Amino acid sequence: KPDLVFSGVKYFNFNNKKVWLNDCLDTHGIPYIASSRAALFNESDKNLAKKLVLKAKIKSADFFITNPEDHQNESSMPISFPLFVKPITGGDSRGVDSSSIVFDFLSFKKKVLEIKTQHNLASLVETYLPGKEYSVGIFEDSIKGTLQAMPIEIIVKKNINGHRILDFDAKKNDEEKVIAVKDKQLFKKLSILAKKAFKALGGKSLGRIDIKMNDLGVPHFMEANFMPGLRKGYFYRSCVLNLGMNYEDMIFNITNTGLSSKEFSKINIRKI
């Protein structure tokens, strides 16, 4: 039986049945990094995630879920333009591009249809937030039960329409710039929101909370990732900029957290 499972897989599909890996590991008493099946389900469904954080009194942009046939005119829409349109589920900003910000009904219908046609998904439509963008890495101390927040700011260049959008191409081509959050008051605000969102969604061990500012500079929850990539992406960079960790240190920290989180004795892991 393994001491600890590192996995970037949430579930498998067998004969049209979805089998969640962490459910199987829990059944057999095998510790693993990251969150339970329930928490992974909460964050992967962006509609559910926003409902849960709003219920916890955490700010998030007004939103609704739609399919191409749902709204036949602008008056039937529950919130007004400008809006941001993205797939209801999925990572890496898939389905997000320069046309995701919509200012009129025709552009809205076109983007919703595109998401349905290309990704076979409903759209999550929310009030567009024009402010700065942040991501907050979260480390849990499983013994003390405390959370450590590690905010970073993500800066992308303006697109042809003059908007800064962290879209699929920007992530794929590594075009964004990541910097530390040095303003102490802002650091505190981002950390508080991220910790509250992590708890509201049932997170464990580690994760990432994405946040964006509105036009008044008020932070709003955007989405969560409870199975962040362990290569040199945003989670790793949040560790570097906030804790001065190198890659090896980050992996050992995650390993010890994963082992202790299931009430297994913490082991002394030697660096090779």
List where the protein language model places each region.
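Active-site nucleotide/adenylate-binding loops and adjacent lid/helix of ATP-dependent enzymes
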Residues: 40-124, 130, 142
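ATP-dependent carboxylate activation and anion-phosphoryl transfer catalytic cores
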Residues: 54, 184-272
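Phosphate-binding site of ATP-dependent enzymes
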Residues: 105-192, 213-220
